[in-house]
Amino acid sequence: RVENEMQGMKFVMALDGSTGWMINPMGGTGKAEKVPEDQIKDMKDMADIDGDLVGYKEDGWSVENHGSVDVDGSTAYKLKFTREKDTKFIYVDAVSFLELKKESKASMMGQEMDIETVYSNYQNIGGTLRPFQMEMRTQGTTVQTITLKTVETNVEIADSMFTMPK
C-alpha cells in the first residue's frame, strides 16, 4: 500500500495479492477503483521490497552480465533481467554491490514508458542497507522523487489495509 498527499489530496494505491486498486482524487472519482489488469504486474514488482536482486529466480527472472559501465562516476555492473516479454537493466556498484540505477518500462495511462530509477542515500535498517531516496526519470526529466524519512521493520499491519473499500 502506498499513500501520497499532493496539493492537500490523498492518493492511495494498494494490492491485496491479486486485486489492485487506487483512490485518485485528481484523475478519478475519488472512490476506490480497480487498477487495470496490465498494471497489476508492475504493482507486484513494486511491492517486492527486497529489491530486484533478492529472489530474482523465484520471481521468474533470468540475468545476464553486460559488463562494467560508468554510472555518475562509479563503476557499475550492468545486469540485464529478462522475464517473458519484460526486460530491465539493473546497475550495481562494483565496490559496494548496492543498486545504483534501474532502467525499465512501465504502463502509464495506457502508454508504455521508459523509466529510469536512481537510488541514493542508503541507510542501515535492521542490518540491511536501503535507499532512502529514489528519483524516477522519463526521457531525461525527473518526474518523481521519493525521500523516506523513517523506516520501521516488523510492524503489525492489518490485512484490511490492503482490501479494496466498497
Residue ranges of each PLM-predicted region?
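PEST-like low-complexity, intrinsically disordered acidic/proline/serine-rich tracts
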Residues: 1-10, 14
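Short hydrophobic/aromatic-rich beta-strand segments that constitute the beta-sheet cores
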Residues: 1-4, 21-24, 65, 99-104, ...
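Short, surface-exposed beta-strand-loop junctions and turns on beta-sheet-rich folds
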Residues: 7-10, 28-30, 96-98, 107-108
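Catalytic loop of the DD-peptidase/beta-lactamase superfamily, centered on the K-T-G motif
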Residues: 11-12, 18, 28-33, 138, ...
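Gly/Pro-enriched, hydrophobic low-complexity segments
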Residues: 72-164
